[in-house]
Every structure is written in structure tokens, then in C-alpha cells.
């Protein structure tokens, strides 16, 4: 089984640059306090690292 991480949106994309809004969409997040379980890859971790004020990793599984 592949390792996964749980990512939670903690900030609003309102009044944020378009690239940050697109990064949230790429992670599958669109509303406050939503969570997604995603595959643990360098690409996903890099996306979360680019927007630490909007999304955080809350759990690592596997």
C-alpha cells in the first residue's frame, strides 16, 4: 500500500495570487477546513510547502 498524507485547507484563497488558488485546486481543496487524503509524493509535498498559510499536512499514513 502506498503512503498517503492528509492535507487540510486552513486559509481562504480570496485575495491570493492566482498561482496559489490553482495550487489549492490541484490539491483538490476548495473550501475552508476540508481535508483530502493524497498520495505521499515529492510533488504533493512541494505544493503544500508553497502554500503553508493555506494548507497543512495533518496526518501521515502508511
Swiss-Prot record:
GO molecular function: structural constituent of ribosome
Alphabetical list of Gene3D superfamilies matching this protein: Ribosomal protein L30, ferredoxin-like fold domain
Transmembrane feature ranges: none
Short name of one Pfam family: Ribosomal_L30
Keyword field contains ATP-binding: no
UniProt entry keywords in alphabetical sequence: Ribonucleoprotein, Ribosomal protein
Any coiled-coil regions, as ranges: none
GO biological process, any: translation
GO terms for cellular component: cytosolic large ribosomal subunit
Family according to the record: Belongs to the universal ribosomal protein uL30 family.
Subunit organization: Part of the 50S ribosomal subunit.
PANTHER family, per the entry: LARGE RIBOSOMAL SUBUNIT PROTEIN UL30M (PTHR15892:SF2), MITOCHONDRIAL RIBOSOMAL PROTEIN L30 (PTHR15892)
UniProt xrefs under NCBIfam families: rpmD_bact (TIGR01308)
Name of the protein described by the UniProt record: Large ribosomal subunit protein uL30
